[in-house]
Amino acid sequence: MEAASTEGVGHNYLVEHSAGSGKSNTIGWLAHRLSSLHSDRDERVFDSVVVITDRVVLDRQLQNTIYQFDHRQGVVQKIDEDSRQLAEALEAGVPIIITTLQKFPFVSGQVAKMSEERGEGRKSHLPTRQYAVIIDEAHSSQSGETATELKGVLGGAELRQKAQEMAEEEGEVELERLFRAMAKRGKQPNMSFFAFTATPKHKTLAIFGRNGEPFHCYSMRQA
């Protein structure tokens, strides 16, 4: 939390938590702390905190844990219906959004459709907002075109265009390639990633880590 407050938006944090380390509790606590994090000017640092699991069905344990931290109406919204529900939550700036990675490929079209219905054309204010993205099991969920859509939805059209170009040239796009492209162009100023994994691969460390190392490590011995 101290680092996120000091460094501001646009950084990656790899959290290596071994099995039995209470990862769901840590993610729940982090989501709520990030959603209420304020700058020195007393402004909210993140407009929304998006908690993503790579499971097709929302992780019930993780979902319940997050709900336990705050029962107030409208603070936490689980996306268990369709992608339109997710798009509406992003547009509304719901403080904490819980969803699966599989829903993101459809969000771009839904956001544009809702903007048109309101007479706003095809421009969405999503890329101008600031997001904290918490990824559960980063090593398994961050690959393919679904992750590319996540970056495009929250990062804007320019990043999505770059991802599409890579997809055309190389077929299936892995997030590692996309992050390398982002690194060359600078970090995305409106997104901070908090990636949780028990078994970080070399590429995961290279992309999310700090100098190839996790930002925080809770080992099996400590657990």
Q: Where are the regions a protein language model picked out?
A:
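RecA-like P-loop NTPase motor core of helicase/translocase proteins
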Residues: 1-223
